[in-house]
Structure formats: structure tokens, C-alpha cells
Amino acid sequence: MEDNNMLPQFIHGILSTSHSLFTRSIQELDEGATTPYDYDDGEPCHKTSVKQIGAWILPPLYSLVFIFGFVGNMLVIIILIGCKKLKSMTDIYLLNLAISDLLFLLTLPFWAHYAANEWVFGNIMCKVFTGLYHIGYFGGIFFIILLTIDRYLAIVHAVFALKARTVTFGVITSVVTWVVAVFASLPGIIFTKSKQDDHHYTCGPYFTQLWKNFQTIMRNILSLILPLLVMVICYSGILHTLFRCRNEKKRHRAVRLIFAIMIVYFLFWTPYNIVLFLTTFQESLGMSNCVIDKHLDQAMQVTETLGMTHCCINPVIYAFVGEKFRRYLSIFFRKHIAKRLCKQCPVFYRETADRVSSTFTPSTGEQEVSVGL
């Protein structure tokens, strides 16, 4: 019997100790939020957990996400700047998407430490890392939208795209996008603070009920409804155009990438946004009881952790799917990694570089990033 009880305790310990910048604002950290006796039966709702087990599991999990995401996005940045030289608007958006993921990822080591211990970095750093987390989160969403619009212009309005899709315009729209991401992150930054609670320090937002509702609605609009509308409209036009394309190989490659973008993004982030909405408005929806509250609390931790892993997938979807991008990556490793291991192969490197440069012209490169990245 004792062994049978270990698995549920193990799982519950992982779920209940996961750090969440968003969920604390809608649970026990709100000022004026639900108290243990606010439920209809008048009984206290004790959210017990096996915190030591979660403290063992979550730091390695966050660390793995950080390592894989950091390496993948740094490779994207190196290839875009060092090899592709940022020659198109698509390159600009891909670069900024990788930067968004890096901002998000840089906070994970600190949340890993927080999951195992109390918050020891002070109030200022609590706000700083919360800001980086939110800015990276919103920035990633907005640049996914810009990449979708960029793809739409390149395929559906190819003539207009020749004039509109410039590096200069890409830089301008990227700056505006970062400004919007900062403004979208302000509520989370302003209401977040570190305070002592039950003899240990925490870091999380302390929203009033009004701001809590506003934050949840804004997040669902910006990170779920808006991307969904843009993707449905743009990809409908893209698919209609591609199905008339005579180049069967190019058409299938582009369609595969488009569906990967849609499915992966919504697969990783839609569950979180739904649970966030249900948790915030559970009382209005008639779901205010201890059992449901516990299940939503656990679901919130799982879905946010799932969403956090999306930053590891972005380099694969937006960069490494492209055939010529993979060739650039291969050349980079052979020149800068393998060359240090084998310094007697200069002819091999020169032949590889000549072969790729002969197949990658400005026109073919632009077609690659426009259709298949």
C-alpha cells in the first residue's frame, strides 16, 4: 500500500511546486483573493504537496529546457548574422524571434533555483526577471505573427512584397514590436514583488481582482485570439495560392512548414491560456470549490511548463527546416568546429563552401526564406 501511494504523491509534488509567474496572481498571492474559507461548504481548502520531490525534479527540467533552448537559439543567431548576413525581412524577424526566446530562457535558471528554494535574489531582481520573462513571452508571439504576415506577403502578394519586404522595414517593425511587447508586460512587472511569506521569501504578482481579470483577458487576446485570427486568414490565402503552384516539391515543403507553425504553437500554448481563463473566472463560471481549485492549480503548472518548452522548438521550426539554412549550419560546424579538430582538411572546407555558395544566390535565397524558411 505504501508503494501505491508514492506515485500520486510524486506527481502531485511536481505539479504543486512548479513556479508560475502567471498563476500566483490568480491564487494564494492575490491581495483580496480567495481565502481558505471562501468556498460554499465553509471548510478550509488545504493545498498540501510533497515539495521536496518537486524541488528535485523541476530544477533539472528547467535546466534542460535552458540548455537546449539556449544552444538552439544561439545557433540561429550565429547563422543569421555570420552566414546569411541578414539579407531579408524574414531574417530580421527570425533573429528577433531567437532573441525573444533567449530573453525568456535567461530567466529559467533563477526559476529553477526558486523551485528548489525560496526567492533569494531580492525585490529588484524579482521585477527584472519577471520583466524578461513577459517581454520574451509576448515578443515571441508577436514575431510569430510577423513571420506569418511576411510569409503571406511573399507568397500571395509577391509583386507588392518585392517593394515592401525590405531589411529597413523589417528593422522598423521589429522596434515597434518590442515597444508593444514592453507595454504588454508592464502590468506583470508593476504588480510583481518579493515579500516574506510564512518565514520564506516569494516572488510573484499581487494583482487586485480588477487587474487580475484585465491581465487574463489581455493575455488571451494577444497570445491566443489574435495569433489564431492572423494565422487562419494568412494561411488560408497561402494555401489557396500554393495549391495553384506548379512546383510540387516547393508546395509540399511550404505547406508542411505552415502546418508545423500552426500546430506546434497552439499545441504548446493553447492549454495554458484555457486553464488561465478558467482559473481566473472560476467563481463566475460556478466552479468555486476546493476540488476544482486543486485540479486547476495542478493543470496550470503543467500547461505553463509545456508552454515554456516551446522556446526549444522554435529553432527547429523556423530555421532548421530550411534546406539552405541546414547547409549554412553544416558549413559553420565544419569551418569552426571540425576545423579545430582536423586542421589538415582545407580543400574539404573550400569545396564545401564553393558548392553551397554556387547554389545559394540572392534570388534563390529569398525564395527559400519566403516559402520554406
From Swiss-Prot:
Membrane topology, Extracellular segments: 1-55, 115-127, 192-219, 282-298
UniProt subcellular location: Cell membrane
GO cellular component: dendrite; external side of plasma membrane; fibrillar center; neuronal cell body; perikaryon; perinuclear region of cytoplasm; plasma membrane
Alphabetical keyword list: Cell membrane, Disulfide bond, G-protein coupled receptor, Glycoprotein, Inflammatory response, Membrane, Phosphoprotein, Receptor, Transducer, Transmembrane, Transmembrane helix
Post-translational modification note: N-glycosylated. Sulfation increases the affinity for both monomeric and dimeric CCL2 with stronger binding to the monomeric form. Binding of sulfated CCR2 to CCL2 promotes conversion of CCL2 from dimer to monomer.
Membrane topology: Multi-pass membrane protein
Sequence positions bearing Phosphotyrosine: 152
Observed phenotype of the null mutant: Following a stab wound brain injury, mice show reduced extracellular matrix deposition at the injured gray matter and reduced astroglial scar in the cerebral cortex. The injury site shows an absence of invading monocytes, significantly increased astrocyte proliferation and a decrease in extracellular matrix synthesizing enzymes. Following traumatic brain injury, mice exhibit markedly reduced early macrophage infiltration, improved locomotor activity, improved spatial learning and memory retention and increased neuronal density in the CA1-CA3 regions of the hippocampus.
Stated role: Key functional receptor for CCL2 but can also bind CCL7 and CCL12 chemokines. Its binding with CCL2 on monocytes and macrophages mediates chemotaxis and migration induction through the activation of the PI3K cascade, the small G protein Rac and lamellipodium protrusion. Also acts as a receptor for the beta-defensin DEFB106A/DEFB106B. Regulates the expression of T-cell inflammatory cytokines and T-cell differentiation, promoting the differentiation of T-cells into T-helper 17 cells (Th17) during inflammation.
PANTHER family: C-C CHEMOKINE RECEPTOR TYPE 2, CELL ADHESION MOLECULE
Family, as annotated: Belongs to the G-protein coupled receptor 1 family.
The protein, known as: C-C chemokine receptor type 2
Protein species of origin: Mus musculus
Gene name in the database record: Ccr2
